Structures are given as structure tokens and as C-alpha cells.
Amino acid sequence: MRFLLIDRITELVPHKSISAVKNLTLAEEYLADHFPGFPVMPGVLMLETLVQAGGWLVRYSEDFAHSAVLLKEVRAIRFNNFVSPGNTLKVDLTVRKQDGALWEFNGTGTVNGNSAVSARICLEALNLADRNPELASSDSARTESYRNIFQQIWTPPA
């Protein structure tokens, strides 16, 4: 199963910051098991929402030069509140440091202004062909796919 957890990017400043939202609905299949009778977004998916938002900032900042943006490290993660169906998880990330392919962020997720998750994350941008030249065509296909998704979730201000 593939999770696209960013419904909309609300603010984007290349190389600096991103804000985005995830609207949680009962249609999310994983809620049937997490937890029966008390559906809440799993903490790992709250973290993944931060990771995906950071990935969009990296891709946009680098004009989609890399086909993969992967989680390298998580530090100081805190889960403070539940995210329930009907809630909107608003995530905000700011760049702490960027060194070559590595991007470090401070990230927070809030529901109605109350902290739900916070973490420091490190992401690595790469192309599959860097590790296996036979995967160059996969890089192109992935990049094109990400560009198409990005156009659906981000509308630049007029």
C-alpha cells in the first residue's frame, strides 16, 4: 500500500520552509485496525507526513533534480496528541541545514493549533542511477510522476 499523505501545500519558500495539510477521514483503510472503536492516525504516519512535506520542499527547491528523497535520521520525536478522523494535521518544516544531498529540518504537526507531533529529521536526495546506472529510466519516470502529483497539491500564489 502506498500512502500519499499531503493533501495540499499551503506555503512554500524554496530552501527555507514548507507548510502543508493532511485531512484525516474515516476512508483511510488503516483506521479500521488502528484502533478498533478508537480510530487515530498512527504515529509513524504522522512522522511520514513530516517526511513527505520535507520531500516536497527538497524536490521543489532542486527543480526535481532527484528521483528519491529518503529519510536518513529522526531525532527528538514527540507525539503529543491524537489525530482523529475529521481532524486536519497541519505540518510545518523549516530547514535547519543543507549540506549537499542532506537536508535537516525542524518539523511540527498541529491539530487546531495544538501540537500533535514534532521532530528533527534528516532527508537525503538521490537518484537511483547514482547507485545503479541501469535504473536511469526509473529516475525519469519517478521524477515525472512526482511533478504531476506536485501540480495537484501546490498552487503558487498569484
Briefly describe each language-model feature range.
Residues 14-15, 85, 96-158:
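HotDog/MaoC-like acyl-thioester-processing domains
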Residues 21, 92, 106-108:
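Beta-strand residues in well-ordered beta-sheet regions across diverse protein folds
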Residues 7-10, 75, 80, 94-96, ...:
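Conserved positions in beta-strands of structured domains
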Residues 3-5, 89, 103:
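Hydrophobic core residues within well-ordered beta-strands of beta-rich domains
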Residues 6, 71-74, 104, 118:
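Hydrophobic residues on conserved beta-strands that form the core of alpha/beta folds
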Residues 1-41:
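Catalytic strand-loop segment that frames the active site of acyl-thioester-processing enzymes
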Residues 9, 41-66:
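Active-site helix/loop of acyl-thioester processing domains in fatty-acid/polyketide metabolism
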Residues 54-90, 116, 124-126:
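Hydrophobic beta-strand-centered segment that forms part of the acyl-chain substrate-binding groove
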